[in-house]
Structures are given as C-alpha cells and as structure tokens.
Amino acid sequence: MQKRRHLIMNAPRTKYIAKTFFGLESVAADELQKMGATDVLILNRAVEFWGDKALLYKANYCCRTVLRILQPIASFLFTSNEQFYRNVFKIPFEHYLFKDGTFCMHSIISNSIFDNSQYASLLAKDALCDRFREKYNCRPSVDKNYPDISVDIYVSGDSCSIAIDSSGESLHRRGYKTTRHFAALNEVLAAGLVLLSGWKADCDLIDFMCGSATIPIEAAMYAINMPAGYFRKDFGFMFWRDYDEKLWQKVQTEADNTITNFPFKIYGSDISAKFIKNARENIKKMKLDNIIMLSVESFEDVKPERVPAYVIINPPYGERMNNEILENFYLNIGNVLKQNFIHSVAWVITPNKDAMKCFGLRPSKKIHLFNAALECTFYKFEMYEGSKKNKNNKENRNYTLHYCK
C-alpha cells in the first residue's frame, strides 16, 4: 500500500521522482523529508516528492539512499505512433536543452503498441529534433555517453510519461573510489544498511568483513554529515539550460558547512591485504583516516575496543563454498558475535537463508532487500549477558542442533 507523508509548508513548485533500491524507499523518503521535500509519496523502488530547484540540487548532492532523481515533464495518452510523435513534439525541451546541446533517450515499455523500446526512443528523438529544427533551424545531437540531458520514457499500454534525469551518472558513483572491488557493495545500498540499522553515530561501528570498506566509508560520511556527493565532479542538472550556478554554489556551501566531528571510531577489517590497501588509499584521500581504522585480520580475532558497538557485515554468500563449509562459516560468525560483542547490536545482510539457520542466534528483526539481482535479508541481532543471554543461548543451541549436522 502506498504511503503519503505531508509537511505543511509553502506550496512546492515541481514534482520529482527519486529512484532507489527495493527496501530503501522509507529511508530515502525520510532523507528527502528532512531536506524540506513536501507531499512525499513512497512508491515501488522510488519516492515521489515536491520541491524547488534548490531542493533538487540539495537532494542530488546530499541524499545517500537515492540512485537518481528524475523531473517529470510530460504525460499523455496515445493510440498510434503518429499520436505519440505529436505529443512528444509538443514538449518544450528547449527549456532544458540548448539548441546545440546533446541528448539521449531511454525507453521502458510494457503492453504497448511499440514492438520494442528502441523504436519508442527513435520516434521520440525524431520529434525532439524536428521541434528544434522548426524553432531554430538546427537540431541538437545524440550523445549516448555524456549527454547534456537524458530523457527517460515510460510507456505502459496507451499511457506515456516522460522525465529528464537530473543526476547524470548514477548517484551511487560517489567519486571517492579510485579502484573498485569486483564484488563491492553498491554505495547506495551500503548507506541504506547504515540508515536502516538505526545507528545514530553514538558509538563505534565495526565491519569485520569490509572488503573495499564501502560500509565503513558510507558510515563515516553519515557520521560527520558529509554530503554523499562531496567528491563528485558534476551532476546532470549542471548541463541543463536553466542551471543556476549561483544557487548551486549556495546549496553546496550550506551543505558543506554542516560537516561535523565524530567522537567515536569506525573499524573495518578483512583477510585480504589487497582490499585493505586499496581501501586505505581511498580513505586517506577522503581525509577520513582519523575516523576509519582498517586492519588485515580474520574475523575470529576481532574484538571491539569498547562496547556497546554496532556491527554491520556483508559476509560471503557462498557461491564458491560447499554447504558444510558455508554452514560452519556462518556458525563461526554467530559464535564470534556472541562471545566478543556482548551489549552490542549486529546486522547481517545475506541471501543465504539456509546458512543463516546455522547462525546460532535468533534475529530480532528482518528487512527484505536486494543486492543487485539477489534477494537478500538484513538480519538484526542483539547480544545480551546474564539471564537473558543464558535463556537465548539455550534456545539458540536447540535451534542450531535442529538445523546443523
């Protein structure tokens, strides 16, 4: 069921659509609402909201859990190719695109008169170019790699919605990684895990399977309120005809001025010296090496410097392990948490439900997410001591013996 959230403010000027991952819609909506978005509507893998141009700039620069932000510019019904062409021709693309600018078209169609999405894009391209030729006696050029504006076309049946992409390159590309681990967690998803976990930057955070340290880096940026796009060079809206550079500089300066201190530490470790070396280089360039402490270490040897602490890990999913090895691996993770992280909270994301049956701990919460195409669950575990710990341990022993041989 869709949820609508309202803020009583001055009437907003423009509707926007923020695209995100399944399961992150609520935290993306919270981020946008805190920035001043109004009429926030949670959709499937997206959030609709209203705001002015300053909010559009700020959302692109600061939102951690958004992949891209679209500005709808037209919607219409059609029953033929000719009608589709005429409706696209009417759209005032010149408000956003210079006559000598560049553009590209992306189409998604379902149950449509079009045989394929490429034909819809081609027809829309012709309509746009013909409009410019009629108005200016010239036409913009197609650039599929680095266009000034990227036009998104959504066709369902006889309905068409058209939007332009204000983000340019996907917002998960923060600009802080010089090298990327082949299986690195998406930055937007990593930030989403941090926000979903409920960590308030009021204690240490630990990722003892950090790989390229995406979770520690995103946690550190959140902890000091560093804008998610702090290291990006540009955004799509900067190439629009109505781009306001002074407004952008104001938005950027105001956001940068909110960067604060973090009195705790974020620890990341991994058994791969190569991953840690690359992560250290990125973190040093970001000037976060006073916050993020990295080490080459097996997870069995990790102990928190102080408790309580928060743990967020993305363990191996077991593609290259047999079932017995994987079950023992997950059992060992659970044992480390029980023995070394009393009074702490741990979160684990994995698609492997069978392996989690051997974890030896009962989750207090589960959140369904996707990591790329993999359907995952984000499990919350709370570690206790004393009578409550003993009670849980007894239950966990029965739980483990039932599922693990």
Regions found by a protein language model. Name each.
Residues R5-P147, T400-K405:
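Non-catalytic nucleic-acid substrate-recognition regions in nucleic-acid-modifying enzymes
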Residues L185-P304, E319, E327:
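Conserved S-adenosyl-L-methionine
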Residues K58, C63, E169-R174, T178, ...:
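Flexible, glycine-/basic-rich loop-and-beta segments that form/coincide
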Residues T20, D270, T350:
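Short beta-strand/turn micro-motifs composed of small residues
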Residues S298-Y403:
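C-terminal catalytic and target-recognition region of SAM-dependent MTase-like enzymes
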Residues S110-I113, E169-S170, P316-R320:
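A short, flexible beta-alpha/helix-coil linker loop
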